[in-house]
């Protein structure tokens, strides 16, 4: 490590302020926190920041549904988010909001600099517009029938059923997801960031060698496909920042969201006197800037964000660390199965250190998805943390307390063994630095196996019963406790709460430098249980609680959904398509009603005598509940004239009168416009 401590600014992607934190979010925040804690443990200066992403149409609409202002809702959600992160020991130096004065000033400044430097243009575009709510509709707020597979109730940008992507204007029977109204096309002036001007800079940044290979390869695909101008504006009504100098135009949420990193850091600088904002963000900054993000937002962080920074005179990120998604038991997180687990639900049932350890044990520096297998989760935490590591302390601490008043030996009996454990520090440090946490955990647990093997071979419980072996017993237990001390130092970034309890037991802080020298002639405190094993029933209870929460939320959401206006077509869908030749076989004619009478002993039928143009027909029709017979005499209607005569109980019916409606009293006879004559063909 260099003599001068590094200065690092580290961020996590900003959680959206319209919902709860779940175990998918926690992967990123735990990954970043482990890396940050490792850097601090090595003496580096780290500013670890985050904020809520608090703007956009979804937040505006959800606040309306909840009957509160967007400001009140995002404040409530922020409190929940911060409570969850604190519960998992995520050690942010500052947690802020994109809806802040700092962010407004920085977003406006960056936009105006980009505009001044010729990177902003405007043009008129056509978008779907909700005529009832009087608002333009984002793609995800339009629903309809997929133009490819014809699946109904699909979003305006892609079909969940067949995976097809499309424009919302291609949907069949599109409806606003906000009001249920049929959207119309409307023109509006929008503002665009000229991303193609930054292609050469972005290619050079990609070739720097610091980006993950998967990210660099993906960027190359985007370059080959051609970079496009980026729409950075949205029309009122919209919850966000107004664009300087424009009326009813707002910054798109993805413009001011990453600027939220800067806004949160600026807020931290204003709180403290020892931080200089410009030192970290100026174009020639010597500090390091790292973003931890999920693979779903690589596009914004690897293209738009560095280009915006470069075009407005700020530094670019040192690196962007991308991770995959979380699956549970090999499948996508599911609310119905209870595997879509909120952070708060987890905290109600299980120790956060368990998840921190399990995620660390499976994380690497690639963009791989991570599977939270709940059975493996239980077994691994119990086997590694309880049986191998914590048990190492409990096997030795009792003897030290009872037989030696808590005092460790004045000399260390196994210097070579200690040197082997301490010598692993550089190797484990390299793995932590490279975010190869899974490999680091494997190194640590391999050392734990050796430590337990040493204790098994020395068998202090046997030595304790032997006369005159007190010094040997104290030496063995001193070695065991020191090996435990090294292991817990290596695990300190992963399990900070367990490390803190270990420090209380050892009566000494765990430091990376301290690993070099064993702890001797030192008093430890009486041993208390440091960690509890996972009971599978706790996991089951968490899953059941998640199911119940999801069901309650779905019921509430369904009740709050705008009811789409029911149409006649939705109540009675179209029949299967027929060929034109089939339709051409039907002979529809205008008929004049010469007489009409009720059929005795029938609740539904009227008997008609019809003139179809020089020929008289007898027809029975089931519209008795809708009309009085005398009211129909002399009217014109439409009849199927070539329908094969049908013998009925009350006589022969020689055609079919056409009427519309669901039935009963809700039936309406089809009548032609004035001028139509009996016998005319209906074309």
Curated annotation (Swiss-Prot):
A Pfam cross-reference name: tRNA_bind
UniProt catalytic activity: tRNA(Met) + L-methionine + ATP = L-methionyl-tRNA(Met) + AMP + diphosphate
Predominant place of localization: cytoplasm
Keywords of the record: Aminoacyl-tRNA synthetase, ATP-binding, Cytoplasm, Ligase, Metal-binding, Nucleotide-binding, Protein biosynthesis, RNA-binding, tRNA-binding, Zinc
Gene Ontology biological process terms in this record: methionyl-tRNA aminoacylation
Record text on cofactor binding: Binds 1 zinc ion per subunit.
Matches recorded under PROSITE patterns: AA_TRNA_LIGASE_I, TRBD
Highest taxon listed in the record's lineage: Bacteria
Domain tRNA-binding: 582-683
Motif ('KMSKS' region): 332-336
Assigned GO CC terms: cytosol
Binding positions for ATP per the UniProt entry: 335
Gene3D superfamilies (alphabetical): HUPs, Isoleucyl-tRNA Synthetase, Domain 1, Methionyl-tRNA synthetase, Zn-domain, Nucleic acid-binding proteins
E.C. no: 6.1.1.10
Binding site for Zn(2+): 146, 149, 159, 162
Presence of keyword Translocase: no
Localization: Cytoplasm
Cofactor (UniProt): Zn(2+)
One GO MF term attached to the UniProt entry: metal ion binding
Keyword tRNA-binding assigned: yes
Motif range ('HIGH' region): 15-25
UniProt subunit comment: Homodimer.
UniProt record similarity statement: Belongs to the class-I aminoacyl-tRNA synthetase family. MetG type 1 subfamily.
Function, in words: Is required not only for elongation of protein synthesis but also for the initiation of all mRNA translation through initiator tRNA(fMet) aminoacylation.
Protein name: Methionine--tRNA ligase
Gene label: metG
């Amino acid at each position: 490590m260099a003599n001068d401590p590094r200065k690092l600014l580290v961020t996590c992607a900003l959680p959206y302020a319209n919902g709860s934190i779940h175990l998918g979010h926690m992967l990123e925040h735990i990954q970043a926190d482990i890396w940050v804690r490792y850097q601090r443990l090595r003496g580096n200066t780290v500013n670890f920041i985050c904020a809520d992403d608090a703007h956009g149409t979804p937040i505006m609409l959800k606040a309306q549904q909840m009957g509160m202002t967007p400001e009140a809702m995002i404040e409530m959600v922020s409190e929940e988010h911060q409570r969850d992160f604190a519960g998992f020991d995520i050690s942010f130096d500052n947690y802020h909001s994109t809806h802040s004065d700092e962010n407004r000033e920085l977003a406006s400044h960056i936009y105006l600099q980009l505009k001044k430097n010729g990177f902003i243009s405007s043009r008129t575009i056509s978008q779907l517009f909700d005529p009832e709510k009087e608002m333009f509709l984002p793609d995800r707020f339009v629903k309809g029938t997929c133009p490819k597979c014809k699946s109904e109730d699909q979003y305006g940008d892609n079909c969940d059923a067949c995976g097809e992507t499309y424009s919302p204007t291609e949907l069949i029977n599109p409806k606003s997801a906000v009001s249920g109204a049929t959207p119309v096309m409307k023109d509006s002036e929008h503002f665009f960031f000229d991303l193609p001007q930054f292609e050469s800079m972005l290619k050079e940044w990609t070739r720097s060698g610091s980006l993950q290979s998967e990210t660099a390869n993906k960027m190359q695909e985007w370059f080959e496909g051609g970079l496009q101008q980026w729409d950075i504006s949205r029309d009122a009504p919209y919850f966000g920042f107004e664009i300087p100098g424009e009326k009813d135009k707002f910054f798109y949420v993805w413009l001011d969201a990453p600027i939220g990193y800067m806004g949160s850091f600026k807020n931290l600088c204003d709180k403290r006197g020892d931080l200089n904002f410009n030192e970290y963000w100026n174009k020639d900054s010597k500090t390091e800037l790292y973003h931890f993000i999920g693979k779903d937002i690589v596009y914004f962080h690897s293209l738009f964000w560095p280009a915006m920074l470069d075009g407005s005179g700020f530094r670019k990120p040192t690196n962007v660390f991308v991770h995959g998604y979380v699956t549970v038991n090999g499948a996508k997180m599911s609310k119905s199965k209870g595997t879509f687990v909120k952070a708060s639900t987890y905290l109600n049932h299980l120790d956060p250190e368990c998840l921190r350890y399990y995620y660390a044990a499976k994380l690497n520096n690639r963009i791989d998805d991570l599977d939270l297998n709940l059975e493996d989760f239980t077994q691994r935490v119990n086997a590694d943390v309880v049986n191998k590591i914590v048990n190492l302390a409990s096997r030795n601490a009792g003897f030290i307390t009872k037989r030696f008043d808590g005092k460790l030996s004045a000399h260390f009996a196994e210097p070579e063994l200690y040197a082997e454990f301490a010598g692993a520090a550089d190797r484990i440090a390299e793995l932590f630095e490279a975010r190869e946490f899974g490999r680091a955990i494997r190194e640590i647990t391999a050392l734990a196996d050796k430590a337990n093997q040493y204790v098994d071979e020395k068998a202090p419980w046997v030595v304790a019963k032997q006369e005159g072996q007190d010094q040997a017993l104290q030496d063995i237990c001193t070695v065991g406790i020191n090996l435990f001390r090294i292991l817990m130092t290596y695990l300190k970034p992963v399990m900070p709460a367990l490390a803190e309890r270990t420090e209380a037991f050892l009566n000494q802080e765990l430091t990376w430098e301290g690993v070099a020298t064993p702890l001797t002639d030192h008093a430890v405190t009486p041993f208390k249980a440091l960690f509890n094993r996972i009971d599978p029933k706790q996991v089951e209870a968490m899953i059941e609680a998640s199911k119940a929460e999801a069901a309650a939320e779905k019921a509430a959401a369904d009740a709050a959904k705008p009811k789409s206006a029911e149409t006649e077509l939705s109540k009675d869908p179209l029949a299967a398509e027929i060929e034109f030749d089939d339709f051409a076989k039907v002979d529809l004619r205008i008929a004049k009603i010469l007489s009409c009478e009720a059929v005795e002993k029938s609740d539904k039928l009227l008997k008609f005598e019809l003139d179809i143009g020089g020929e008289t027909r007898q027809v029975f029709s089931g519209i008795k509940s809708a009309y009085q017979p005398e009211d129909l005499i002399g009217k014109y209607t439409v009849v199927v004239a070539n329908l094969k005569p049908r013998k009925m109980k009350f006589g022969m019916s020689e055609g079919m009168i056409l009427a519309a409606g669901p039935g009963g009293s809700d039936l309406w006879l089809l009548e032609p416009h004035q001028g139509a004559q009996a016998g005319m063909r209906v074309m």
